[in-house]
Amino acid sequence: MSGASPTRGFVPGDVVPGAQNAPAFTDAADLLLDSTGLQQASGTPGLLLLADGTRYEGKLFGSEGIAQGELVFTTGMCGYQESMTDPSFAGQVLTFTWPLLGNYGILPGISESAGVHPRGIVCRQVMKIPDHRDSVGSVHEFLAVHGVPGIEGIDTRALTRRVREHGTVLCVFGPKERSDEMKEILSGMTPPDAEDLVASVTCEEAVLLNQGAQDDEGEPLPRLAAIDCGIKYNILRELCKRFEVVWCPASLDFDSIISEWHPDALFASNGPGAPAHPGDAASARESLAAAVRAEMPVMGICLGHQLMGLAAGLRTYKLRYGHRGANQPVVDLQTGRVDITSQNHGFAVEDPDKGMLACLLYTSDAADDTPCV
């Protein structure tokens, strides 16, 4: 990630208190507007190495250098800019299963954060000259200004099948001529789940986004403390339509949240890494548990939901390859109805009684019979 700030992309001076003022955020695409003299992708021969010994050859684009992380894939046909700027992908090398990446370029105002969070991008083909009237640059240029490498020309179908069959795997890619260096890096890699990834993406200080927010009848909206475990901009925007939102770092303890901000409810966001990690994720988990003890309403999305499960005494576990993309089938366990959903998570809450969570969630993933959250 690049372009971080104490409030991770929030611009306080651009917000006027009141119900009709949406928060303003620094978009990851803004760096392209300030950049000049960017070079086209060099097409340097590249090499992708997996920890199981599998290797793929391709061509490099984006930032020069070596990328390393946990290899995962996402199945969306579009929305690549939102995926690349989603903090939940921190620590990972992101593969796009759709064969063409970047056909409409990079658009202003649609990023989910101020930076690019995957440590590397893998695709079949990257569009060199995007075709959209609002585009401010190509995917290559976008990754280059954010310091993130990419590799194209990879058989992503074979790569995806490998991950589906055997699970996520550590990987490294970079210039083919540096293969010996990459092998050495790969041999010493540890899973990113061991890192405090939440600490790397959370904001550094609490800020009130929409002070004085009101509903359509002029009544004050309830105040929500949103714990930032890697929250996406669009979640903040949607919350601000319904609440007066305090954007809080994951490390901020519950007593401080209550004494300084006096919220009516607590929310825990999406984010990267293992929910049982002892770092900032544990701090957020403790705040959720304290809120429950105080009989305060709580809610969680993605990692936030997993933290709620841990706070309630349940356990979480890592999915074999995760659920990432816009076409994830989910079945309602009460009615049998199947919906196609957008998901992005690599962990789930364990259902020890094979039915205890059904009354709470009503849903289970139809693709591999695992919980959808």
Residue ranges and their predicted role:
Residues S2-G3, R8-D255:
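RNA-binding accessory domains that recognize and position tRNA/RNA substrates
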Residues R242-F243, S283-E286, A358:
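Glycine-rich, phosphate-binding/catalytic loops in enzymes
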Residues D353-L361:
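Short, intrinsically disordered, charge-balanced linker/junction segments flanking boundaries
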Residues Y362-A367:
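Conserved small/polar residues in nucleotide/adenosyl-binding loops
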